[in-house]
Amino acid sequence: MIRTDAKDGALVLFSGGQDSATCVAWALERYQTVETLGFDYGQRHRVELECREGVREALKRQFPAWADRLGDDHMIDLSVLGAISDTAMTRAIEIETAANGLPNTFVPGRNLLFMTIAAAIAYRRGLRVLVGGMCETDFSGYPDCRDDTMKALQVALNLGMDTRIVLETPLMWLDKAQTWQLAEQLGGQALVELIRVETHTCYVGERAELHDWGFGCGECPACKLRKRGYEAYLKGERVTEAPL
C-alpha cells in the first residue's frame, strides 16, 4: 500500500449522502487540503446533489478547525451514464432484484467511471488521495463497491497515469451503525445531527418528511438500511469503536 501523510491533499467523492459526508469529515480530520467531487448522472434522487453545498457550508460553520481545509468543489456532468443505464437508479421503475441476483439499482461501471474521472482531476490538482464511501459490509451486492475492485482500480490508475494515487475507503468494513458511530467520533453529536438532517439517501428522492434517521420515503432499500443502522447505533448494537 502506498503511504500518505497529512500534507497530502485529498479529493473526496461526495454525493450529498450519509456515507460520503462522513468520508468528507474523515478526510478533513486527516489532510490539510480536502476538495470534493460530485457527479450528475441522471439519478432519480438528484436532490442529493442539492444537499451537497448545505453540507459543505454546515461543516465550515460548525467545525472551524476544518473550515480552512475544505477546498474547492467540483461537479461533473455524467448524463451519458444515465443515458446508457436502464436501472431503477436512473429510471422511474420499481426497485427489484434482477435475473443476475443484483438489485436493479446497480448502475454498471458507475464507481469505475467515478474513480477514473476523480483520478484525472486529482492528478491535475496535485492531490494524492482519493476517498470514496464504498462499503462491503452493509451494501446491496454492487460489485464495484468491493474492496478487491478498489484495490485493482488503484493499481490500474497508477499504471495508466504513471502516478502514485491512493484510494482510501474508510467505510469498507463498517456497517451502517458503525458509520454513524464514526461520525460521532469525528465530530460528536453535532456531526451526527448535521448528517442526519442535511444529507440525503433515499433512492426515490423523497425529502418531505424528516424521520428520526433523516429524510426519505422510509420504504426503499436505502432508507431501510439507513433507518436500521441509525436505530442500531442508538442502541449500541454491533457498535464497537469504529477505526479512525
Curated annotation (Swiss-Prot):
InterPro entries: QueC, Rossmann-like_a/b/a_fold. Transmembrane segments: none annotated. It is an enzyme of class 6 (ligase). Its cofactor is Zn(2+). CDD domains: QueC-like (cd01995). Binds 1 zinc ion per subunit. One of its GO terms (biological process) is queuosine biosynthetic process. Keywords: ATP-binding, Ligase, Metal-binding, Nucleotide-binding, Queuosine biosynthesis, Zinc. ATP binds at F14, S15, G16, G17, Q18, D19, S20, A21, T22, C23, V24. It catalyses: 7-carboxy-7-deazaguanine + NH4(+) + ATP = 7-cyano-7-deazaguanine + ADP + phosphate + H2O + H(+). One of its GO terms (molecular function) is ATP binding. Pfam families: QueC (PF06508). Its EC number is 6.3.4.20. Gene3D superfamilies: HUPs. Pathway: Purine metabolism; 7-cyano-7-deazaguanine biosynthesis. Zn(2+) binds at C202, C217, C220, C223. PANTHER family: 7-CYANO-7-DEAZAGUANINE SYNTHASE (PTHR42914:SF1). Catalyzes the ATP-dependent conversion of 7-carboxy-7-deazaguanine (CDG) to 7-cyano-7-deazaguanine (preQ(0)). HAMAP family: QueC. Belongs to the QueC family. This is 7-cyano-7-deazaguanine synthase. It comes from Burkholderia multivorans (strain ATCC 17616 / 249).
